[in-house]
Amino acid sequence: MPTTRNNIKLLYDTDDADCAAIIESLSEKNATYLRRRRLLEGPSAHAKDLVIECAEAIKQDSSPALLDRFIAQVSENATEFEILTLLVAGWFALRQEQWQVTEMLGREVVSRDHHDLMAQRLIDAARETSKDLETETDRWLRTRTCGAPFREMETRVNGEVHFCCSAWQPVPIGRLETADEGGFWNSDRAREIRRSVRDGDFSHCSRWHCPQIAGRRLPARTEETQSLKLELEEGPDRVILSHDRSCNISCPSCRTQLINLPHKETERLNQVFEDHLLPLVSKATKIKVTGSGDPFGSRHFRHLLGRLTQAGPAGRRIQLHTNGLLANERAWNDLGLWDKVSSVWVSIDAAEADTYSVLRRGGDFNALRKNLRFLGDLNARGDIDTLRLDFVVQAANYREMPAFVDLANEMNADGVYFLRLRNWGHVTPQEFKGLDVCSSDHPEHKDLLEVLADPRMAWSGVDLGSLNSI
């Protein structure tokens, strides 16, 4: 367990009281750091600034020898310390050009919480041997812009709202229940995130997990984008609905057991949709369901899809993200999806039945293939605009990536999307380290790089997404 004030003295007082005092002072500020990560201390109170402020204060009162002892204590016992302590030690290590120590401390934080942007930036800076934290990506971002904070929103299971996936941009802009009051779309946090994008610092965006950043796909800044307003009159043009985790299978990449909301909670979410979301989605041109579970395995999302096909303007507004096991002709008929769906993204994580049975617990590979043929036929006939197959890369499946490309071609898919495994808090940090083959310190990471060099991975339909950063 991470160190707390109750056991610091037991661990360190007898050996190094000065080092223990530093650790205790950081422990007292750890909760503040976690709040700052979400801009809960105010839009100008950034988490990165607190790390550097703490480091500067410690440096003023400490000898070089004490700082060396502090870095050594934390790095030798990294699993015992809280996040802020690890990051401050990582910052000192970076400034001293201890690149491997910096990266190790950053990875300890990421293994606990993949949302921590400071840890990601420390790792990237260490890889590029940059003492001041600035990387090539930061320099590139100063020339780029992103439209998501100006036209998109995503709902989350905990009732919070983000501009996009919380792994890409971890700061929530507000809560669902304030939607009808305009309470999140132009909140202080929303305006701060828009400012960071407009000004090119992208302070609240993940350089790792955002596929637009990792894949270098953001459009260039222009005079027009540099003068974008931070407070918007129009609501979102694209709405991503990810507030129900119900699913018909239990994939170990995101959960430990089957999740299916009880009827009472489903009824509550149905009412939330009617009261707070329907006015928003009725004006949106694109509506994605879902980034949290399965649109067909959730009673709530099935209700929602039925409402969407009945309400709003005609046309293909719906984007479906599904495991594919229930995405069949019956679903299209029952929910009135014909000529209402623009894109279908199918999460599979395997190219072989044996691997699929492990990584998609409760799934049936033969049933999936049958439904993929149905979706592929829709795509070939032009009944949907896009079909994509998705694959979360991890130690158990990375060798099947080229075969997954073959599967996509067989099923008339337009492309494949590979993404890094994330720790959503469902596994221990140590377990995550064993699964995260994308990490450069994983024992099979070099084998992954060889797989990425397979000629099939050069297909124009391959999108490496967040893997581009490796």
What are these regions (language model features)?
Residues 168-212:
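Membrane-interface junctions of multi-pass transporters
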Residues 22-23, 36, 64-74, 100-108:
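Alpha-helical repeat scaffolds
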Residues 28, 56-61, 68, 95-104, ...:
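Radical SAM enzyme [4Fe-4S]-AdoMet core and its adjacent flexible, acidic
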Residues 172-173, 212-344, 354-370, 378, ...:
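Conserved alpha-helical substructure of the radical SAM core
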Residues 31-35, 78-82, 114-122:
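Boundary/linker segments of alpha-helical solenoid repeat arrays
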Residues 39-42, 72-80, 110-114:
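Solenoid-like repeat scaffolds
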Residues 43-50, 82:
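Residues that mark the junctions of alpha-helical repeat units in TPR/alpha-solenoid scaffolds
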Residues 52-56, 84, 88, 92, ...:
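"A position-specific structural signal for the A-helix of alpha-solenoid helical repeats
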